[in-house]
Amino acid sequence: MYAEITFPLHAQRGAAYLTAPNIPARHAFSTRLGGVSTGVLESLNLSVRRGDTPENVRENWRRLGAAAGLDLTRAVYAKQVHSADVRIAHAADAQPPEHEPRFTCDGFVTNEPDVTLAVFMADCLPALLHDPAAGVIGAVHCGWRGSVADILGAAVAQMCALGAHPED
């Protein structure tokens, strides 16, 4: 028997996003609803790699962040390569979203409360991990290659290095 979980849709401030009710840490799953991008990208496009202008991408990230209560104008994100590599993220790693990513990996963990972690999905799965007792969070891009290579195990190990306990 599977538990049914509903992901509420929130639409405000020019963007729409989903949340998971069983994750107490502030988070958002973006949608394509809202935004200022035009033409074939007409939506809440979050990537300059699709041919959108940096200004549109920056504004779309700003709108999503304003709607979700997150500072997405500076986030930690990576060039995702379907690996099992998970990095510990720090505030100094954050950068504007229209810049090329500094890191090549498929997940981040942090224990710094003001660090926003971002991972991108297409046909892969996101995993958000949270140890509320230790104040450690993780965001992981789970493609099939990374899943086979145990990216979630790597994320839990990195979280444990920051003081998390899997049972929490």
Where are the language model's segments positioned?
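Glycine-/proline-rich flexible loop or hinge segments
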Residues: 39-52
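Generic structural signal for well-ordered, non-membrane alpha-helical segments
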Residues: 23, 53-61, 148, 152
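Conserved nucleotide-ligand handling architecture
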Residues: 1-29, 33-34, 39
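Surface-exposed, charge/polar-rich loops and edge strands
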Residues: 2-5, 13, 114-116, 124, ...
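Short acidic/glycine-rich loop or secondary-structure boundary segments that cap or lie
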Residues: 38-39, 86-87, 146-149
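Short amphipathic alpha-helical segments enriched in hydrophobics
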Residues: 29, 34-37, 65-68, 72, ...
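Residue-level recognition of the N-termini of beta-strands and the immediately preceding loop/turn
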Residues: 25-26, 73-76, 166-168
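Phosphate-centric recognition/catalysis
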Residues: 54, 58-142
